[in-house]
Amino acid sequence: MLTHYQLCFQKRSSQNYTVPDPTSCFDVPPWTILCQRATMIMHNNSSALPLFSNVSSFWKRDSHGPGLLDEGASLIGSYDSPETTESFPFSTVETTNSSLNATIKDPLGGHAVWQVVLIAFLTGIIALVTIIGNILVIVSFKVNKQLKTVNNYFLLSLACADLIIGVISMNLFTTYIIMGHWALGNLACDLWLSIDYVASNASVMNLLVISFDRYFSITRPLTYRAKRTTKRAGVMIGLAWIISFVLWAPAILFWQYFVGKRTVPLDECFIQFLSEPIITFGTAIAAFYLPVTIMSILYWRIYKETEKRTKELAGLQASGSEAETARFVHQTGSSRSLSSYELQRQSTKRSSRRKYRRCHFWLTMKSWEPNTDQGDQEHSSSDSWNNNDAAASLENSASSDEEDITAETRAIYSIVLKLPGHSAILNSTKLPSSEDLNESADELQKSDTDSQEKKPKKLQPPKSIQDGGSFQKSFSKLPIQPGSAETATASDGISSVTKTSAALPLSFKEATLAKKFALKTRSQITKRKRMSLIKEKKAAQTLSAILFAFIITWTPYNIMVLVNTFCDCVPKTVWNLGYWLCYINSTVNPVCYALCNKMFRNTFKMLLLCQCDKRKRRKQQYQQRQSVIFHKRIPREAS
């Protein structure tokens, strides 16, 4: 049997020989083409050798010339002898060649070595950072009890989805890019695509849940946070994963059975139904465009609400040097000024307020009017003292840095004023005005005069007070009623004046007490609001960073998906980059936590520096010392 080398030798010895065609005078192709074809078939595949077992018929088949030439001519489809008794099996050779091409693909996918090294290095670094970052989030949630909040449960679910992407999706897609073809079969392809799309969409759904949680926590802090439990958070997380699974997994795994055939080639891996425009648009809208629209709207509302809270807090923390008015707020929320407590502060320095103290308030009372009539001086002095004492009582019960009483403290007034046993206060819709106080004082003086009690005495000679002008006013002492008395000391040389608590209406005392409690708790309320606002700002910053990263990384791919539905005009390199950008979002999320959340940042640092064991040891040592101290104290106490 002649080998293929012998055939090529005989071919080269007769290179100039041509076979005349008795019917069409067709020139046979050069010997070079025929030799290359025969050599490839017989050298690369032993299964093709039986085709040439009858070498004599293959080499010299008829009288027109060497049979090899005849067979070579028929092999390229250009010569067919009518006297041929055997035909060369052309279809078998072509099938063999196609199988050879499938099994001898370039393992580097046509890439140069340096390109493969660069791709593997970059994608490997990104995958490693993704895995480490999301593992840090999960471990931080485990070791730090302060991170076990409802909001962080959503971040934990997001980290799990991103970890799946880093471990499975990134590495398989990198292998697919480098090799240039899919080498793991159809089943592995469908499973990879299912895990990839479900985890990616779960990441999106978790971001959507976090956005809703932040929005309701800020806009409905009382009603929503009472219902915001760990169990409800688990239900919402479960729904996010279930929706993602239902949206992608069945369609990816069973679409070939729905349509009755699989159109994805064996050496490629992509979603089969992406060629259907309606389904592609539907999944793109449900998986990306609708969630990103909702998240953008929610974030805008969160931003506006946070800005509004910031302005309110700035109003609560307004400087005492600014002109402000102490206001009581009606329970319906409408602001209503009360003249007896309307302490119209002038824009003066604190030193001026300390200098004049009560006199400053006495001079700025609206109800006080200078009276030069000597006959009415005592009565006017009594009225003026009434008003001035009201202001002085308020000044004694609060610091000089009082702030406006806004809606946050109206509940305190309601509680204090609605004490049992005071029907007059319960039935009143507003606190007594200065006119009411004046009338009460007038009636009290009149009743005292009728009962022939002692008349009010002059306390001191008139004293001049300088505050933008000269005022001269004398003070009178109100009649003393039976009961406990208080002593109010006037500053700047004004002598002590003794008055009774019964001289003022009971409602005024309760109003003063209400203001005292309100101002005392005001700093605590402001502090709590400030801390709450800081937390809301941090949460909004974290959400904004995550949302921004999500939009940047996911938009290119989802645009290419829609474009690819109508035309196959997206370059393969651009498609791979867009696909990888979606993966990078899973890398960015843990970085957003670390940059925007101090608690996560400190826990990351503790874990990376291996300080967790040291912290536990210090805690154990502290507990042991405390135990020793406790046991030492017991015998002493027993003795």
From Swiss-Prot:
Q: Name one GO cellular component term.
A: plasma membrane
- Enumerate the Cytoplasmic topological stretches: 140-152, 213-232, 301-542, 597-639
Q: What is its main location?
A: membrane
Biological process according to GO: adenylate cyclase-activating adrenergic receptor signaling pathway; positive regulation of MAPK cascade; positive regulation of smooth muscle contraction; saliva secretion
KW Transferase (keyword) present: no
Q: Where are the transmembrane segments?
A: 116-139, 153-173, 191-212, 233-255, 278-300, 543-563, 577-596
Q: Which residues lie on this side of the membrane: Extracellular?
A: 1-115, 174-190, 256-277, 564-576
Q: Where is the composition biased (Low complexity)?
A: 382-393
Q: Which UniProt keywords apply?
A: Cell membrane, Disulfide bond, G-protein coupled receptor, Glycoprotein, Membrane, Phosphoprotein, Postsynaptic cell membrane, Receptor, Synapse, Transducer, Transmembrane, Transmembrane helix
Q: Which domain of life is it from?
A: Eukaryota
Tissue/organ expression? Brain, heart atria, and ventricle.
Q: Where, per UniProt, does this protein localize?
A: Cell membrane; Postsynaptic cell membrane
Q: Which PANTHER family match?
A: 5-HYDROXYTRYPTAMINE RECEPTOR, MUSCARINIC ACETYLCHOLINE RECEPTOR M3
The entry's protein name is Muscarinic acetylcholine receptor M3
Q: Which organism is it from?
A: Gallus gallus (Chicken)
